[in-house]
C-alpha cells in the first residue's frame, strides 16, 4: 500500500501461495554454458496451478535480474577468447596456454560484491586470470571444482603504491628495483608505471635495471 497506493495490489493471492507451500511452476532452460544466437530464449517459466497464472510474470524480473549480467560477461569473455585464439594461432610457435592471455579488472567498478562475483564468474569461463580473487573460491564451491583449476589472481601494484614509494624514496627507480630483487624475486607481477613519467621508465629506468630484470624469476608486466 505504501509503495504502489492503497488497495492497488491484492495481497490475497500471495497469502494463498504461502498456504500452498511451494512454487507451482515449471522452468525449462538451455543447458548451462550453451552458446546461442541473439533472439533465442534462454529459459521459460510455465504455471502449473490454475490459481496462480500471475506467478511466472512475477518471477520473471527476479530471475532475469540474476541472470543477465553474468551471461553478458561470459559472452564478452568468449568474444575476447575467440580473438585471442585467432591471433595466437597466427603468431605463436608454441602451445601457450591461451586461457592466461587476458584478465578482468572490473572489481572496483562493479555495483557491489555480488555483481563483481557474477562478472568474474562469467569471465572465468574463457580465461583464468582475474583480479576479482573472491570469485575463484566462489566458482570452485558452486561447481565443485578444484580451486586450482578455476583461475588465479596476480600480484599488481596500485597507483597509490607507486606514488607513496616515490614519496619515500625520492625517485622512480628504487621501488621498481626493490620489487624485482626483494619483494617478488620469484613471482610475476604487474607494475603500474603511468603514475611516473611512463616513457622515462620505459626508455631509461628499465634499461638501467636490465640485469635485475634478467635475473628475476618471473615476468614483470609494465
Language model features with spans:
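Buried, small/hydrophobic-residue-enriched core segments of structured protein domains
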Residues: 3, 8-9, 15-24, 33-36, ...
Amino acid at each position: 500500500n505504501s509503495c504502489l497506493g492503497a488497495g492497488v495490489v491484492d495481497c490475497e493471492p500471495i497469502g494463498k501461495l504461502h498456504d500452498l507451500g511451494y512454487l507451482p511452476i515449471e522452468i525449462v532452460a538451455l543447458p548451462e554454458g550453451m552458446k546461442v544466437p541473439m533472439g533465442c530464449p534462454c529459459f521459460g517459466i510455465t504455471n502449473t496451478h490454475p490459481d496462480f497464472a500471475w506467478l511466472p510474470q512475477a518471477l520473471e524480473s527476479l530471475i532475469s535480474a540474476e541472470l543477465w549480467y553474468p551471461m553478458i560477461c561470459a559472452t564478452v569473455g568468449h568474444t575476447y577468447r575467440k580473438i585471442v585464439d585467432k591471433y595466437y594461432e597466427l603468431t605463436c610457435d608454441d602451445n601457450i596456454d591461451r586461457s592466461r592471455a587476458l584478465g578482468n579488472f572490473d572489481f572496483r567498478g562493479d555495483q557491489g560484491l555480488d555483481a563483481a562475483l557474477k562478472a568474474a564468474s562469467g569471465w572465468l569461463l574463457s580465461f583464468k586470470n582475474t583480479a576479482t580473487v573472491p570469485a575463484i573460491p566462489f566458482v570452485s564451491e558452486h561447481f565443485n571444482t578444484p580451486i586450482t583449476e578455476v583461475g588465479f589472481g596476480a600480484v599488481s601494484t596500485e597507483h597509490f603504491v607507486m606514488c607513496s614509494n616515490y614519496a619515500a624514496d625520492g625517485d622512480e627507480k628504487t621501488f621498481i628495483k626493490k620489487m624485482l630483487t626483494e619483494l617478488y624475486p620469484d613471482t610475476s607481477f604487474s607494475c603500474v608505471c603511468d603514475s611516473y613519467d611512463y616513457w622515462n621508465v620505459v626508455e631509461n629506468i628499465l634499461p638501467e635495471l636490465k640485469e635485475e630484470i634478467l635475473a628475476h624469476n618471473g615476468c614483470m608486466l609494465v
